[in-house]
């Protein structure tokens, strides 16, 4: 829903626009998402999480993030996150065309 609202507000800037958001998670994500229009920067600001990336060739990568660490989700890479206790992260996302699928 957040991507739909962003898309409506930022339609004029298209793929050049970025959605900047911060979320706190207390459990692992229940879905995957993918941003075809550009890379996404994920900055962990508190707690820890493991970002799970699925590349187009099917290869999986896990990136452990603690407070102060960051990762980049390249365009077209499906990603989700595992959270053991709690994590807060900032996301800088090329939100146009974002897709979701169940985990």
Would you name each region that the model predicts?
Residues 15-18, 25-28, 46-50, 57, ...:
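Short, charged/polar surface micro-motifs in flexible loops or helix N-caps
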Residues 17, 38-41, 86-87:
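Short, surface-exposed beta-edge/turn micro-motifs
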Residues 29-36, 53-54, 62-63, 82-83:
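Short histidine-centered beta-strand/loop micro-motifs
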Residues 36-51, 55, 92:
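Short, conserved beta-strand element in jelly-roll/cupin
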Residues 48-50, 69, 88:
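Structural motif
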Residues 55-75:
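Short acidic-glycine-tyrosine-enriched beta hairpin
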